[in-house]
Amino acid sequence: MKKIVVAYSGGLDTSVLLSWLKNKYQCEIVAYCADVGQEEELDGLEVKATTTGASKCFIGDLREEFARDYIFPMFQAGAIYEGQYFLGTSIARPCIAKGMVEIALRENADAVAHGATGKGNDQVRFELSAAMLAPKLVVIAPWRMDDFRAEFPGRAEMIAYAEKHNIPVQASAKKPYSMDRNLLHISFEAGMLEDTWFDATAPSARDMYKLSVAPEDAPDQPEYVHLLFENGLCTALKADGTDALLDQFSLKPLAVKDGFTYLSPYGIMKVLNALGGRNGCGRVDMVENRFVGMKSRGVYETPGGSILFAAHRQVESITMDREVMHLRDSLIPKYAALVYNGFWFSPERDALQALVTESQKHVTGEVRLKLYKGNIMAAGRRSAFSLYDEAIATMEKDPTQSYNQNDATGFISLNALRLKASARRASAAL
């Protein structure tokens, strides 16, 4: 082993891991940190990495790529895992893995290393992504190595190691939960949350949340947001206070037209996160089925993603053909499972994405949503490609006479044939 690229955050765990790998393999270590919107302080990270033992440190700004190439295609597919989870952590891992693999190939490294534990899903996501992108790279997972776990059975041993080896980390008191943040969401798990009866909405847990206010603390007046979609992808939005948010996040509009602000996918997510967060939207508490076989409780904040999901569904409702929608809906659990289980880079996900792209070619229009104390309510939808015909749908007299109610008699009779046959068979068996 001559060179290893290590996924690095600058925290205690990855700093110790970096130093330990250098000592174990006696080779060059390159640190890699991906910025996927985790809002961590990255200044000084290169110095910290080289002081710890890395020959160099790369920081990849993947925020726009993450939104454009991962979040938006996934929401275009309507993916949601087990009916609740918007896959915030799951979708970030292939993006990070791709960035790390690209650095490894550029640096002619022999291996990549990550700090994911042997009990979680992330180890699978990182390694399956690497297998598809660069099958010749060796993947090192220290937490699955007996000697690493023996040396570091707990946090105290890591702190002692850092002090002994002059690793520049500031060890803080461990929080009663673990947290993972990116542009799409924040996840909380472990610690106090391992008790499935623990109330994550209780006042004692109030300080845990970072992206959203508690619904009961949200404004007493509803807030409206309009979103424009083109081919199933959100391109623009309109809401009170948008300009202030653009200034706050240093975002430059691509265009401003008819009151709508056109933004890049990254900009869309930043603004929607702020809008949803201040209205208490996007909190989920669930017990999910991990790919590695166990059940795990997670608490998630996905304010912007929740708005995007709801709006996309509304514009689909008037623009998608019924059978195309039902076909796509039947594939959502499979698509979501592929993302959750680490198969973003796979031929089957590519095939599903092609179907999604075809299904979305007329999903273009405007949606109006009402945000109020944690609720996201549809308040209108319209499209030049709408399949909704008010003249046909009306309960009043149809001026077009394109729907003859008498035709329903034959339709019902034909659909009842198999039911009557089943009933006759059941009666004969008595």
At which residue positions do the language-model features occur?
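Nucleotide-activated chemistry modules centered on ATP-dependent adenylation/adenylyltransferase
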Residues: 1-7, 12-430
